[in-house]
Amino acid sequence: ELGVERRFVPESCPRAVRPGDFVRYHYLGAFPDGTRFDSSYDRGSTFNVFVGKGQLIAGMDQALVGMCVNERRFVKIPPELAYGSEGVPGVIPPNAVLHFDVLLIDLWNSEDEVQVQTYFKPEKCPRTVQVSDFVRYHYNGTFLDGTLFDSSHNRMRTYDTYVGIGWLIPGMDQGLLGMCVGEKRIITIPPFLAYGEDGDGKEIPGQASLVFDVVLLDLHNPKDGIAIENQLVPESCERRSQTGDFLRYHYNGTLLDGTLFDSSYSRNRTYDTYVGKGYVIAGMDEGLLGVCTGERRRIIIPPHLGYGEEGRGKIPGSAVLVFDIHVVDFHNPSDSVSITVHYKPSNCTVLSKKGDYLKYHYNASLLDGTLLDSTHSLGKTYNIVLGSGQVVLGMDMGLQDMCVGERRTVVIPPHLGYGEDGVEGEVPGSAVLVFDIELLELVSGLPEGYMFVWNGEVSPNLFEEIDQNHDGEVLLEEFSEYIQTQVETGKGKLAPGFDFEKIVKNMFTNQDRDGNGKVTAEEFKLKDQEAKEEHDEL
């Protein structure tokens, strides 16, 4: 009788040998006394054969039926189910009982197809692999008995290929179709859809079934353009970015499987660039057009519009890029100051002009609403002489032609604000500034170029009046005391908003033409006299 002893049966046995199946197995052949007559191990290759088709001795044909991959059986075959009364000359004597220690390695049928078992699938799957798509995936490749023959993980790089155009073995071409990014599946491929009778000449023997444990990381098609997903669009969007605009934005950059490769947030500063001029990758150039300040959008960029086949830094070659961006502000180099008046008193006859002394309150913010500064929090006004360079040029422009009590919003582009450098720790570089302003007080200034004017007629003996000790020389102390008296008595007026001592010293220095610290009658001239002399010379 045929004797079959199951010495090891794996816990999992999804499939057992049936007549007509093709098997690969190892064996030791011995006589009952233990004398070995054959071994597949000695030859270094499995025995490969169809079961139930008369290609084996009858006893082995029967003994293999019902076996699982990785199962081990001890088989006793009587001579009438083996080589009978004739035996095999020189190897097996007549009427010999044969013992076989069998280990099943592989099993398939010519009717088999590719088997796909998905064991993880993301909840969101906006796109699946189609013919002609380009994919990047990791895999572990094993035989049916679990022996590893290859792994992309060991090489620490994905396998990158087109699907469905013959770049892969036919079974893998089929097995990858319909996958989502992030999906994990086991693809079992019979040899006639893999490397066939000859194997690959290296690690994979002939007639081997292959098992690939695959995780899909990336997917695109060469015909893809960028994809934009609007995540947040402000209700108010007065202006959208155009080619030539300069943008400041934050971003998180990830691969399609969610792997982070870069983030402006980690550097605590925005990414600042022109749009549509080739300063950024082509896909980002396109994806940043038409955005509003404050908008959040996701831009998905295929590799031919990103970093191509070579990649860069942490970005692998042929990688789809996902940028989650937040637009902080944008402007155009041709922009000027923008003024929006919210309130203007009905009696608005005196308008601010260059040289006027202004007191005003303001709230300063970035274009996205981030508060930078506020005079209200300081409890005092901000005081300047308009047009004197005490504020940025854009503010000088924005405060022109205001009346007391007026409220307005002034938007200042960076080239009229703090420029590319900004103010360290306070104002970012290339930032658009928004000032909400209320003018509280206006003191009219003097004509341009004047630091002091008379409110009445000028004394014809002006030098003698200043020279109190009549020594023919005026010192700074005498000059300062005289000017102060004129201001206090209302006979003269100093330019408002400046330090008294600095103005007086400046006036004195202008008169002290030889720089000896004294002004003589010959040096002393009024401004209108100086202008007349210059005219006469001309």
Regions found by a protein language model. Give the residues of each.
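Cross-family detector of peptidyl-prolyl cis-trans isomerase
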Residues: 1-538
